[in-house]
């Protein structure tokens, strides 16, 4: 006999890893300068298998004149038969300065820590420019590109049959110049259903880190919706013993606060 339980809680006020899109609801009375997105999900299987996984996301954005401050964190934990088989978190901070209504300059930082990726950490500082290709009530599409510097530390991990880590050995830290790029899309099919998608890439000599997300959201009330999402994380050059791709599928309840001054997340 097999049982399966899937629970999700998602609070949203933006869009994907860095920006936020539009709606008419301020975060507080008279305050339309903030937007927030929080995600909390949990999945468990029992019977022939014994797996559990939890994921957390917090994204925030704040408007200060021509400046937009974007910051957040994400985390994932998974276990199989009582052994840890997934453990990762990231944090980011980005500041955008509006040069025009569509064009902006940005500077930012990002830190990725994924115990099972083959890298103890990947930390980057970056700067570049972004452009709102489409900015309508129904569709918002933003791209950005720039350069930066990254530090990463490869590690050799040995896993057991279940997928838990038996041992890990950190190697020397590496530094490289990276190309930083991202795109974000938010499209409303109607007043109840919309699509959220985003991709970020940090590509350098030592590794190319790609994060891609897509989610379909169905509105239930002004604040609540149901969401089904998929995330892909790809490291092009992991050390021996580590695979290059990880995926996460989520189903959750969405709580949404929006800010029309903020475009979709990057």
Q: Model-found features: residue ranges?
A:
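Cleavable N-terminal export/targeting peptides
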Residues: 1-33, 257-266
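Repeated loop/turn-to-beta-strand initiation elements of outer-membrane beta-barrel proteins
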Residues: 34, 66-71, 102-105, 137-141, ...
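Transmembrane beta-strands of outer-membrane beta-barrel proteins
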Residues: 36-38, 69-71, 105-107, 125, ...
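Transmembrane beta-strands of outer-membrane beta-barrel pores
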Residues: 42-46, 64-66, 75-79, 111-115, ...
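Residue-level signature of outer-membrane beta-barrel architecture
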Residues: 44, 60-62, 97, 111, ...
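Solvent-exposed loop/turn segments connecting transmembrane beta-strands
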Residues: 44-52, 80-86, 113-121, 202-211, ...
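Outer-membrane beta-barrel transmembrane domain signature
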Residues: 138-225
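Outer-membrane beta-barrel "beta-signal"
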Residues: 216-219, 245-266
